[in-house]
Amino acid sequence: MAFRVPNSSLLSLILLSLLAIASAKVFFEERFEDGWDKRWVTSEWKKDENLAGEWNYTSGKWNGDPNDKGIQTSEDYRFYAISAEFPEFSNKDKTLVFQFSVKHEQKLDCGGGYIKLLSGDVDQKKFGGDTPYSIMFGPDICGYSTKKVHAILNYNNTNNLIKKDVPCETDQLTHVYTFIIRPDATYSILIDNLEKQTGSLYSDWDLLPAKKIKDPEAKKPEDWEDQEYIPDPEDKKPEGYDDIPKEITDPDAKKPEDWDDEEDGEWTAPTIPNPEYKGEWKPKKIKNPNFKGKWKAPLIDNPEFKDDPELYVYPNLKYVGIELWQVKSGTLFDNILITDEPEYAKQLAEETWGKQKDAEKAAFEELEKKLQEEESKEDPVDSDAEDDDNEAEDGEESDSESKPDSTEESAETEAEKHDEL
């Protein structure tokens, strides 16, 4: 009996991966199992205004494992703020991996699904939208224009948005978002364990002034040829070109039989555009033999640039917090992880989302099918239309009575929050 020997390089990779996972330092890991509520503090932010939303502990309306629960927003037009503390640490000389899963069950049209990492001392009971944070990461959806992953880094007390566009998932299933920051100031953003963006903290955020700038003293040389095409000096205008009329008498026009010259005046044939007329003559263009390209000022060292070898460092990370405003509730968070090992994060994602995603999708599709079947069993079209009219009238009254005054400003509030990000 023959045995196949594993490829040595593949075996080495597997061993390295196992060693990395075994040596991983986990700073925070929350799977929302028993006792989770003792680790998390719900903020009193917005409670005085009756705008603080309640969190539900649930696996959601559809899931891949009913025993795997997370926390879910439960009330529309509400603010949400909750946080957990962990032993303070610095990511100096370490890779920082921030990961969590999120599901929007509510067909989200405007709202966030991001989480924040906070530093220093925070009054968790007062944690809210004005609380300073170090990192904000996760999906954000609002209308047709905003469907992206936020990756905001605080540097010198300024929040800096990533300059690259990273599209987020927009369906109603669970997805895993991972943000990796390395000691060499590079980063990666993953969705469902697949890399969606990578680059440098130097180039993809405006954390520092540019290393190079255009020389303000440089001027384009007078003899610089930046026209790629020029008129052909050998091209000559054809003889008689300017004599060609723009319009000519319509050769097909005929004087009407009932035309009376004495009463109607002398008949004149109408004119039509002359097909021979080509407009103002211009010589044809040829490639400029002296073309040097578009002139650009040379780059020089920026005197205002000062490198920061610890650009990637957050020296006193201590809290993870979820702070949201949601017009429609139903966003569910789970499996929040902060570690120094990407392989451990990948393994956690596969153990949770990876094992459940197919069952969750099947459960969602089954529920959608049942809803469609129920809709098809409704009353005939005419009755439906009549009912819809009645419901619309009732709805207008009930909406005006049931919504708090603050909801009238909800669209403006949401727009303001997105403008601030």
Swiss-Prot record:
Superkingdom to which the source organism belongs: Eukaryota
One Pfam family from the record: Calreticulin
Subcellular location: Endoplasmic reticulum lumen
Residue stretches of biased makeup (Acidic residues): 223-232, 381-399
UniProt region (Disordered), positions on chain: 217-283, 350-421
Gene Ontology biological-process annotations: ERAD pathway; protein folding
Residues carrying covalently attached carbohydrate according to the record: 56, 156
Binding site for an alpha-D-glucoside: 114, 116, 133, 140, 323
Molecular function (Gene Ontology), one example: calcium ion binding
Biased composition regions of type Basic and acidic residues, renumbered to the chain: 233-257, 350-380
Range of residues in the leader sequence: 1-22
Motif Prevents secretion from ER, residue range(s) on this chain: 418-421
Positions in coiled-coil regions: none
Disulfide-linked positions: 110-142
PANTHER family: CALRETICULIN, CALRETICULIN AND CALNEXIN
Entry function: Molecular calcium-binding chaperone promoting folding, oligomeric assembly and quality control in the ER via the calreticulin/calnexin cycle. This lectin may interact transiently with almost all of the monoglucosylated glycoproteins that are synthesized in the ER.
Family under the similarity heading: Belongs to the calreticulin family.
Protein name as catalogued: Calreticulin
Originating species: Prunus armeniaca (Apricot)
